[in-house]
From Swiss-Prot:
Official protein name in the record: Large ribosomal subunit protein bL33C
GO molecular function: structural constituent of ribosome
Family matches, as InterPro entries: Ribosomal_bL33 (IPR001705), Ribosomal_bL33_sf (IPR038584), Ribosomal_zn-bd (IPR011332)
Entry GO CC: cytoplasm; ribonucleoprotein complex; ribosome
Family from the record: Belongs to the bacterial ribosomal protein bL33 family.
TM annotation in the entry: none
NCBIfam families associated with the record: PRK00504.1, PRK00595.1, rpmG_bact
Length: 55
């Protein structure tokens, strides 16, 4: 089982327009303590949209 204080936890990225969770990635908590916002392609919207980290 993963530690609760893992430095590189798995996070889920959700589209800000349609709210679909499309991507799973890892991030470094020490370098990026805030939520990530990345421009990614959303297959449901069919265009490049902002994806935000979900909890």
């Amino acid at each position: 089982m993963a530690k609760t204080t893992d430095v590189r936890p798995k996070i889920t990225m959700a589209c800000t327009e349609c709210k679909e969770r499309n991507y799973i990635t890892k991030k470094n908590r020490r370098n990026d303590p805030d939520r990530l916002d990345l421009a990614k392609f959303c297959p449901r919207c069919g265009k490049k949209t902002t994806h935000r980290e979900t909890r």
